[in-house]
Amino acid sequence: MHPVVSEKRQGERVSMIITAVAVGTRGDVNPLAELGEEMIRRGHGFRILTSEAFRTLIESKGVTFIKLDTDADHVMKYLVTDYKTSLDFAKGMFRLKKENPGFMEQTLNAIKGSDLVMYGTCAAFARHAAEYLNIPCARIFYSPMDPTRQYSLYSDEYDSDKVLKSYDGLPQGMSLMTMIALNGWRCSVGLPRWRISSRYTEMNGRKVLTFYPTSKVLMPPDPAWGDPIHVTGYWYHPEEAAGDYEEPKELTDFLGSGKKPVFVAFGKAESPELARLQLLTLDALKRTGIRAIVQAFQITEKERVNTDKLFFIDAVPYPYIFEKVRAVVHHGGNTTNGMGLRAGLPTLVIALALDQYFYGRMDNRIGCGPEPLYIRKKLCSTDEIAGALEDLVSGRYDAKARDISRMIREENGVVTAADSIEKYVSE
C-alpha cells in the first residue's frame, strides 16, 4: 500500500492527494476538473498540472491549478492536429520536449507528495516522473487502448479476431515513442532505459489503474479486462455547466423564427483541414437549406453572415444550446459527443482524428446518427456532407437518441471513478 498523505478521515475514507497532468484541449481538462470537484467533496486534495489557458476552468471547481509552461494550441498542433501516424506522434512529443526542456522538472515538482498521479495519452511523460518518485499511476483514455475483440480504433469491424489483432502493434508503438522522446531523461535520473517490450499497463509489479471516462452504452467494457480497468461513464455534471449564460437577443430571434436548427461545432484546434471542413459544411448547409447554429472559430468575418437559415456564434455552453436544437454535427470529441447523446440529440460526426471517427462509428452502431465522415479517410465533399445532413434530420434517429439519453443519464462517472481511486490507493 502506498502511504497516504495524512490520517484525516471522512467517514471510512483516508485523505489523499491526487495530481493529474493534462496536455490537450478543454475536452482533456474539463473531465479532470469535474473529478477533482468530487474528490475534494470527499475530503481529498486534487490538483491539475496543465496550460495557463485552463486556470479559470479548474479553479472554478475549487481544484488547485498548477501551471505547465506550454501553450495549449501549440501542443494540440504537434500532438493531435498533425498526428497521422505513431511516428508523427513521436516526432511531435520529441519536438515539444525539446522546445520545453523544463517539462519533466515541472512535472516532478508538481507531483511530489501525491498518492496518485493521473495522466492521459498526451501526458504519458508523467508516468515516468511518477515511476522516479515511486508514486502509483492512473491512465485516462478517451478511446480504446486495451485489447478487445469488441471494437477498435484501427478496424471498422466488430466482435472478431481481426479486431483483436488490430491492437497487436499498439504497445510497441507506445514504447517506440517513449524510447525516442524520454530515454535520455530516464538515463539522466538513473531509471533503466525504456525498451520495446516495456509496458504502460503496469509499474513496479502492480497493474496500473485505467479509466475510460465514456459511456458503457457506447463502449461496453470487455469482461476479460477485469480490474483495474474501468469504463465509468462521462466525467461531468451537464446540468451545472450552463451557469449564468445570457442568450443574445439575436440568437433568441433566430430560434423563434423557424424550425429548430441543428448545431454545428468542430472545436478550436488550428488546422487547414478544419478550416476546409467548416467551409464544406457551410456549403452543404446552404445547399440543403437546413437551419443551423454554427460555432465557427476559423471562419472569416466575410463568411460569417447571419441569414434566416444560418446563425454564427462563438463561445456558448453546450448543455444550454443543446436544449435549443434538433441535432448536432461535430468532430467527435468524447466530451462533446457525450453531451449531445445525453441531451438526446441525433449526431453526425465529421472527424479530424482517428479517435473521433471511432466515436462516430459507435454513434452510428447504436442508432443515434448517420455513418461518420472522416476527412483523412475519405474525400469529404459538399455532396457527402449534404447527404449526411439530410439523413441526420430525417427523423429516423430521433427515438433511439431519446432512449440512449435515458441510459446515459443513469450513469454517474465521477462517483464511479472516485470510488475506484479510493479503493486502488488504499490497497
Where are these regions (language model features)?
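Nucleotide-activated sugar donor-binding and catalytic core shared by glycosyltransferases
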Residues: E7-R9, M16-L49, A53-F65, D88, ...
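Cofactor-binding loop segments of dinucleotide-utilizing enzymes, especially the Rossmann-like FAD-
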Residues: V23, S51, Y142, Y234, ...
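Nucleotide-sugar-dependent glycosyltransferase catalytic domains
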Residues: R41, E52-P261, K268, E273-L279, ...
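General beta-strand structural signal in soluble alpha/beta enzymes
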Residues: I48, Y119, V294-Q295, H330
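Acidic/polar loop patches that form or flank catalytic/metal-binding clefts of enzymes
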Residues: D69, V294, D398
